[in-house]
């Protein structure tokens, strides 16, 4: 028997290699079997690939004429386990092979890596190039040990590409025709052991060519989809990067623009500050302009306007009486006074404020209530009363001519307060005719109708008095004036003696008609024939009579 009869030693593997005796090349089967293990958990796909690369370089150095890997697959390796299997089976080796040179034996660790490389076959398959992946059924997807058996492994029922000793023994025994050994090894190889997870096996024995073609198409479609996904991620990343760069450029431009505007603002402020002292067009006192009666006027002229308001309003009847400091008596170009340098045209007139003040009696004023807003008050507004001359020197004047005006523009809807005694009480006072007094009262009333200084004086705070106004009941109202000659007033009302110290202050009529009884009121009001026909606004009120001061 020669070596040519063994298919395992054909020139596919031992091409251009001198033959040598097998006992000198390989160790015993027991030694190799004791070292090799089927499971090598310490090997990783990276170390396995490094071992394969080292073996490939060694083979390429010894075979310079063959293009290693030119057919799309790595050069198969001759491992010691196949040689040991032949020796263990007792196959005779001719003596003519002893003169062959000996190749150095492989390291056991390398043999372990090659033997167990199928345990990581799923990882190695993913690392192959695209030509090998698209051709699933090519010989590039078969492992090294299966290819070492050559056509013998293809002749087995389901070799499955499992790299173990049972497949090698089954291949050798099937080649030699040993039926018993071949059948037992074939039974053990029917159930290939899957050592670890990963992808499905590259080649399935029960798969039809149509299914293999479908698998190839499906894998190609999956690869294209994965490539599209990667491209989409790359494009999205590039778009985001470009957007970030654009935003950064925009931010830089905005910062530069802000700096330029700030510099321009500083320059303008500097120029303005340098020009203001030398500017003759705008005066500093004309910058603050206030309004008066809807007209623009400088603030410095309000004092002059307030001093001459009485005289101006006396000559200009279209002025507003309810505002103090009214500037009137000007020309129609008052709106331009804030921009002109000419003084205002104020007409001098006699100041009649001193003449009016001597006829006006000061009364307390509630500062929380405006005297002009009489509609917001419940009671009569606090008005100014004119001190009349003695009643003995006053003529019999009608009530409507002696009403004290509260201002031309006050708009009060409340009952006017008369300044004289009611007509019903007229017989109690000796009245004489004096034309001079009538003229004096009428002139004072006319001046008060046009003068705005009454409201101006109402806003001036005054001292609060310590006495209350009390009016003693007088007149022919069925009062018994038996003790009229005695000081202190009447002591009887309709024959009933008054024994209380108040003397008519808290009587029934005053409690019912004059208020709560706690405020000073006048005597009981008894209507007569003359006052019954008067207008309700002209009826006498408890505060209508001339008041007297009574110490509490």
Curated annotation (Swiss-Prot):
Pfam families: bZIP_1. This is Transcription factor kayak. Residues 240-247 are annotated as: Leucine-zipper. PANTHER family: ACTIVATING TRANSCRIPTION FACTOR 3-RELATED, FOS TRANSCRIPTION FACTOR-RELATED. Keywords: Activator, DNA-binding, Nucleus, Phosphoprotein, Transcription, Transcription regulation. It comes from the Eukaryota. Belongs to the bZIP family. Fos subfamily. Residues 110-145, 177-234, 304-346, 365-390, 514-552 are annotated as: Disordered. Its main location: nucleus. InterPro entries: AP-1, bZIP, bZIP_sf. Residues 135-145, 304-325 have a biased composition (Low complexity). Homodimer. Heterodimer with Jra. The kay-Jra heterodimer binds more stably to the AP-1 site than either of the two proteins alone. One of its GO terms (biological process) is embryo development ending in birth or egg hatching.
